[in-house]
């Protein structure tokens, strides 16, 4: 045996002793790596096998999961029973799950929130009707089949397809067939199964005294809600096309769209004739375009709803009413007792004027009090007299306004807004206005006060330059048109409100004035607008009046406005309105321009509310007479008579009305009554202390366009 050879026992001993230990460890490590690779490969293969096939169609998301899948948060399908329930053996109990209600749906029944619209849809009205029919019918009498809740959206024939009776008079200028579009309150329902269609069988005789089939129905049928939102036929909404998962959401969306699109389709007629009213016995009447505005609701033609359309309110059986379409028109409304009822939003009145106090709206408690007018139209829609005498139910009526009694002459516009765009040919010369304002301020105010006003105007001068440097002549003309159009709109508000109001340009020139402001200050409208000469000598001095002896602060009245010419168009005279600075005392003028500098290009919706002192309009003759009366009062000669004489002078300044001194009432302290009392404010010192609020309105170029000011005297 070779010395290098070993026996098997020796090899085993060497292995035990560790001589071959490194080779064994390397072998074990190699096996572990191979096993790890195999496990990773198996996992990768399993993951690839479990991955979705990219070529298979994408699963469509289910609109609503079933109850079992909803509880288990599993993916469900639209079919019922779903595949998961079939695999688990729950196919008999597979039904749609109920979602968590939103806050605005807490009062809605669960049946309404179920997906889909079918014949078994929950309906309060039909549920109550079925209960009543089931209790009132005997087992031996066959019951009439009730129509399902799902109504077809097929449009019914138009109104003009109904035949007319020859004994009914009809004016060709009125009626829905002459409208360009359908009324917004016009849900078209199909005629019921039990009602004959007059279009399909026009030759069938129809009695004028025939009442709808719902006339003999039990009152319990009409105890449900007046507006049933669960009816899918409401205004013929196609809920399937709206692709809503929620039934209530689809109805809400459809109703909003109906109101938004239906309001603009109202026929162009008098606003009073379009108002829907609830006439006698709850009949919904809608005046036609040709109806007289003074026509009472009982004489107006029922346009859409008949008496059966209001049974939810009156709780009485309907009464037949002959309409413009003859007796056959009752067939349309005869089957509407089990249909939803709704009204569209009507348009607002065309003017802001209110009727007289004796023509105010009232709640008429007796339908017999409706006044019949001789010019109510060529047709009549009065109910049967024998039936109307049996029941006199309280009804709600629209205001019975007579057209001839509407006193709107003082507030009615005499011109059209389009005339503004035709009359404005040249831009307004704001440069001349600012030059005139600067000259007036230098003449009236002291150098210190003039400097404060100049600093305020200088702070906004760069903004004016920056906003107007890119404007050409056409832009300036357009700016003046915008100003005149806005001023035209403000005239109604000034006349409607009783607050002393003035509107002036950004230069401070008066552009509009209310009657109350003239009564308060004595400044006539023609003088403020520059149409008549300004002879005011009151500049708010210590005595309130300026005499010839005063040197500083005196102001020479401007000549007649026709002598002042526009620098841009010297051929035509330029009227010079009164400046706002002429209406306020010195401190109020300075405070106004300092506030104007902050608000002109600041907050576009901001306003300033503070106090001021308005200057009364005083001429030199008034100052001489008042100075003489004051001298007599100081001398102790008939002071009371001089005070009465001063009050007498006050009665003839704003409106030109004179007051007799003997019949003049002596007002007590704090007493104000009528125009005379308003004129008496501030007459002694020529100043009226007021609280006023003003704001700046800008034009389309973001430039201050006009200033609106409201005054209230401090009494």
Curated annotation (Swiss-Prot):
Q: Matching Pfam families, A to Z?
A: PAS_13
Q: Where is the composition biased (Low complexity)?
A: 386-400, 650-662
Output the GO biological process annotations, alphabetical, semicolon-separated: cellular response to starvation; gluconeogenesis
Q: What does this protein do?
A: Transcription factor which regulates nonfermentable carbon utilization. Activator of gluconeogenetic genes.
Q: According to the UniProt record, where is the region Disordered?
A: 1-28, 129-223, 354-414, 534-569, 628-663
Species the sequence originates in: Arthroderma gypseum (strain ATCC MYA-4604 / CBS 118893) (Microsporum gypseum)
Extract the PROSITE patterns matched here.
ZN2_CY6_FUNGAL_2
Protein name listed in UniProt: Transcription activator of gluconeogenesis MGYG_02011
């Amino acid at each position: 045996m070779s010395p290098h050879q070993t026996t098997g026992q020796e090899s085993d001993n060497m292995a035990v002793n560790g001589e071959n230990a490194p080779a064994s460890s390397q072998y074990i490590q190699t096996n572990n790596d191979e096993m790890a690779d195999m496990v990773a490969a198996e996992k990768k293969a399993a993951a690839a096998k479990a991955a979705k096939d990219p070529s298979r169609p994408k699963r469509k998301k289910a609109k609503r999961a079933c109850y079992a899948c909803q509880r288990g948060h599993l993916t469900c399908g639209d079919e019922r029973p779903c595949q998961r329930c079939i695999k688990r053996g729950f196919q008999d109990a597979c039904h749609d799950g109920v979602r968590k209600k939103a806050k605005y749906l807490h009062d809605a029944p669960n049946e309404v929130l179920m997906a889909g619209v079918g014949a078994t849809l929950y309906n309060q009205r039909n549920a109550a009707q079925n209960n009543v029919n089931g209790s009132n019918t005997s087992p031996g009498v066959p019951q009439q089949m009730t129509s399902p809740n799902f109504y077809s959206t097929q449009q019914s024939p138009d109104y003009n397809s109904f035949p007319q009776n020859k004994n009914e008079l009809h004016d060709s200028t009125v009626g829905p067939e002459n409208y360009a579009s359908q009324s917004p309150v016009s849900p078209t329902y199909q005629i019921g199964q039990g009602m004959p269609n007059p279009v399909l069988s026009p030759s069938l005789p129809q009695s004028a005294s025939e009442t709808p089939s719902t006339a003999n129905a039990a009152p319990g049928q009409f105890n449900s809600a007046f507006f049933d939102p669960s009816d899918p036929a409401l205004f013929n909404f196609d809920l399937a096309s709206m692709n809503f998962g929620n039934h209530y959401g689809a109805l809400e969306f459809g109703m909003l769209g109906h109101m938004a699109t239906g309001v603009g389709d109202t026929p162009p007629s008098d606003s009073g004739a379009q108002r829907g009213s609830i006439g006698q016995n709850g009949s919904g009447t809608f005046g036609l375009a040709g109806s007289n505005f003074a026509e009472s609701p009982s004489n107006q033609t029922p346009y859409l709803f008949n008496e059966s359309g209001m049974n939810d309110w009156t709780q009485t059986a309907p009464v037949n009413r002959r309409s413009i379409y003859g007796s056959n028109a009752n067939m349309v409304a005869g089957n509407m007792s089990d249909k939803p009822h709704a009204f569209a939003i009507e348009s607002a009145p065309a003017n802001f004027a209110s009727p007289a106090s004796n023509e105010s709206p009232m709640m008429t408690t007796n339908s017999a009090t409706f006044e019949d007018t001789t010019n109510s139209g060529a047709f009549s829609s009065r109910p049967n007299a024998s039936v109307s005498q049996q029941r006199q139910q309280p009804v709600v009526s629209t205001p019975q306004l007579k057209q001839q009694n509407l006193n709107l002459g003082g507030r009615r516009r005499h011109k059209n807004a389009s005339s503004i765009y035709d009359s404005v040919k040249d831009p307004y010369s704001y440069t001349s206005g600012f030059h005139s304002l600067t000259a007036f301020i230098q003449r009236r105010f002291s150098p210190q006060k003039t400097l404060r006003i100049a600093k305020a105007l200088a702070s906004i001068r760069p903004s004016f330059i920056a906003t107007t440097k890119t404007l050409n002549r056409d832009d300036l003309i357009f700016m003046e048109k915008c100003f005149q159009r806005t001023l035209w709109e403000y005239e109604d508000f000034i006349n409607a409100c009783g607050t002393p109001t003035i509107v002036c340009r950004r230069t401070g020139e008066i552009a509009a004035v209310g009657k109350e402001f003239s009564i308060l200050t004595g400044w006539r409208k023609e003088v403020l607008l520059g149409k008549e000469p300004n002879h005011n000598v009151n500049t708010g001095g210590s005595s309130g009046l300026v005499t010839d002896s005063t040197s500083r602060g005196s102001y020479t009245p401007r000549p007649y406005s026709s002598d002042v010419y526009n620098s841009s168009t010297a051929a035509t005279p330029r009227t010079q309105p009164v400046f706002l600075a002429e209406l306020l005392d010195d401190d109020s003028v300075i405070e106004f321009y300092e506030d104007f500098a902050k608000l002109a290009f600041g907050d576009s919706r901001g306003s300033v509310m503070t106090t001021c002192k308005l200057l009364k309009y005083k001429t030199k003759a008034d100052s001489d007479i008042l100075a003489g009366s004051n001298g007599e009062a100081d001398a102790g000669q008939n002071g009371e008579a001089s005070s009465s004489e001063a009050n007498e002078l006050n009665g003839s300044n704003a409106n030109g009305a004179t007051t007799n001194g003997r019949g003049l009432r002596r007002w007590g302290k704090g007493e104000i009554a009528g125009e005379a009392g308003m004129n008496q404010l501030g007459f002694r010192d020529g100043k009226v202390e007021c609280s006023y609020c003003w704001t700046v309105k800008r034009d389309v170029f973001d430039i201050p366009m006009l200033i609106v000011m409201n005054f209230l005297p401090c009494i």
